[in-house]
């Protein structure tokens, strides 16, 4: 099996069940945007970027009642998403999120077989750790993708023959993600548990599948939504920032 085919397989195998389910039920329901609020008051010093809540579809940083609600649909293996994280996110947080005027929600999308183990690790240490881990994964993206790219085809084929919940542990090991996570406070024992969590895996696959159902014009990653409206031709901070400014008027 070619490398690209295998690395898509981890997503495709699980997505098949979600697709079949949607065919039986008709269209999938829209994502519930309810935020599971654990803190809705300004933190000490008024820095809203310290407030993170889990949502039905991802994680939200900032004021849940912000005037402008920004949603990013991103993939942790996506180089353009990494570029947005590098160039746009620092300004987004400092200028817009901290004040409480804008909230930023990250919703995962699965482009590549490695997106599943990467997301499972980013979610592994709880709500407060999600953004630091996800941003660190973007920073080191080239390294862990290079490691999996160097794995011989025969070894990848052996991984493919493992049960699904073991495949993600092995993919994470081959990409160096478990050692990477351990250096950032996610123990080997904990990452093993998270990587074998079939409920989390199924949830990530379903959330990714639901994106194209809820947003038929979804153009790929990264994509951005402001107050419920998908933005067109907006895949960079340079394109996004003027639209944030306009929404704040």
Regions found by a protein language model. Name each.
Residues 110-220, 225-229, 233-238, 242-249:
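Cysteine-centric redox/oxidoreductase cores and disulfide-bonded domains
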